[in-house]
Amino acid sequence: DGLVADVNIPRGTVVLAATPIGNTGDASARLIALMEGADIVAAEDTRRLYALANRLGIRVPGRVVAYHDHNERDKADGLLDQVEQGATVLVVSDAGMPTINDPGLAIVRRAIERGLPVTCAPGPSAVLDALCLSGLPTDRFCYEGFLPRKHSERVQHLRALKSERRTIVFYETLHRIDESMADLLDVLGPNRKMALCRELTKDYEQIRRGTIAEIRQSVVDDPPRGEMVLVIAGASEEEADAAAPATLSIEDLAVLSVDRAQEDNLRIKDAISQVVAEHPLSDGSLANRKQVYNAVLAMKD
């Protein structure tokens, strides 16, 4: 009849389907029907797919292929060739919705480029669950994925978000939560409201709510385990204004460039490039490096 049974999806379609993030009971009827009816299932981890099917008491009769971060670009076109021939390809990740910190984006982009249909069977999402349970504003938010691993990059990333007015959502691991909370405290200060959400939908689900300082102390006193989502209040108007970078004049940039060249033993042109990149103008553009260089020369006259 040209449709995948029970889900009203035309054959010859790529379907992204959300899988449970912890509680098997959250598997939707559409996910189950697709697992049973898709011609091909592209799974981030085939073992976890079969384990889910076993818990659901179903079979996966279609061809199952591994589709993960390391091969998704190479596999995308081969899967889409099958879609062109009328196959339904179901894409699933280990937990949650494909493409959200999981494989899937490559096949979506290539399908769009090739004019092939793509649709979703929505479902569980750790980002949205944590946001809803945090008690923080949900009308405007930004999702930042995992915080950078390296301390210096993490601090730089947080500084760039210091004036962000929207609620901010991160993922974090148990191995880095202590360091990340210390950096959040240093960069964003002690008083912002936040929530640390762990083991969402599982037996040991826990939501810790409080200020950054309070949650940081709770992490020290009682280190959390499991998968975590951090939800942090956006900056107040006063915080955003205070964190907004001041626009520096060409002369200011010249002084900073000379200092940078001396401190880091750089050529002046290299120092200028660094300083200009670090201090954008109020409209987001970068100062003219030649003008800064001329200002440096004028300082020497």
Predicted regions and their residues:
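Generic beta-sheet signal
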Residues: 13-17, 85-93, 141, 166-170, ...
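Conserved helicase motor
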Residues: 65-74, 146-150
